[in-house]
Amino acid sequence: RSAFDVIAGSSGSGTLGALAKTELAQLRQGIALIAAHYDRVIVDLAAGIDPAVTLFAAIEGPTLVVVTDEPTSITDAYAFIKVASMNPDTTAQDIRVVVNMADTPEAGRKTYETLSRACGNFLGLTPKLAGIIPRDTAVRDAIRHQTPLLTRSPNAAAGSAIAKIASDLAH
């Protein structure tokens, strides 16, 4: 049996971005202490490259960068990878890409290759592809009903892709 705990933050409050560097460091240290009691810790961060995001990305373990095929998403993902890979405080060298809302597997692969090529050409690194999550109406349905995707639609294509990514990360 698998179990997990969730520590929820305030969405869109701006509080994290307003913390001083010392406060961010204390929060990161607290999360690192809690992490010792778990097999995996997932920190869901906002898009962007503000100090809070890059500091938490430096927590040891794989860093998943979620990207869609929209140009702004690819640009944000590239900027994050650049800052994270060049930050001397960062231990996040295991950067992996998750392509979300891909219309087809080929479109997802193309999105990954666009980002990967830019990283290779300009940063000298190639992030691994963690997985491709297809666009799936079951996701919107689960959100509308405020129910976890795999509870509401256990056979959803997006859910299967997410489960595969999670399984790969666990091993």
Residue ranges and their predicted role:
Residues 1-36, 89, 141-148:
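P-loop/Walker-type NTP enzyme "switch/lid" segment
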Residues 17-19, 45-56:
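Conserved ATPase-coupling elements of RecA-like P-loop NTPase cores
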Residues 28-40, 50-72:
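Inter-motif core of Ras-like GTPase G domains
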Residues 74-92:
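Conserved C-terminal guanine-recognition region of P-loop GTPase G domains, centered on the G4
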Residues 88-90, 119-126:
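Short helix-capping segments at alpha-helix termini
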Residues 122-150, 162:
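Beta-strand-loop-alpha "switch" segments that mediate conformational coupling across diverse proteins
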Residues 153-171:
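A cross-taxonomic marker for long C-terminal extensions/tails that follow the last structured domain
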